[in-house]
Amino acid sequence: GLEQALHNTKPSTTIEKHIRKITAQYIGNAEAEVLKEIIYNNKQLRFSKYLNHFNIRNNGLFVITTNYDRLIEYACEANGVLVDNLFTGKFLARFDPERSKYAFCSNLITSGGKRKLEYHPKVTLLKPHGCLSWQIINGKPYSVHQTHFDDNLIITPGINKYKEGYNEPFDTHRAKANTA
């Protein structure tokens, strides 16, 4: 199929860009339909049910996916579980893995002269192949939720996927996934 052909032949930059755009449009349109079902028809995603089997407290839960869509994010938030995707902010969220881990603090407890941070229940979501909301703005990775599907940061199949995986934010997501 397509993946094998792209592994055997290096496509031009223009072809790769079109593949990314078409892939993002296809998945994005399907994702939009699912989101409508969640909002208007109370659709519960399978991952929402799956989350109920975990006791997500201070340490949270690590989830690693190669999917570009945001269905895991929707499932988590529908269950009241926050999502750490290593970006900080809400509308133009910057890629900031160091700062993102503190964004979920709920309390600072002092006991016996020692301080300990408490965190809201969260899922740390690692996407080593990218996400539909990821964009490069002024040379830096951002997560923009209401984005067009023109130039998303997603790694599609092909020879170049290994090279692309060493760029940010993919590299950090991959490295954290390897240690999770």
Region annotations inferred by a language model:
Residues 47-58, 115-118, 176-180:
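A short acidic-Thr-Gly-centered motif at the start of a beta-strand
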Residues 1-76, 81-83:
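Gly/serine-rich nucleotide phosphate-binding loop at the start of the catalytic core
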Residues 23-40, 75, 79-179:
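Active-site gating loop/helix substructures
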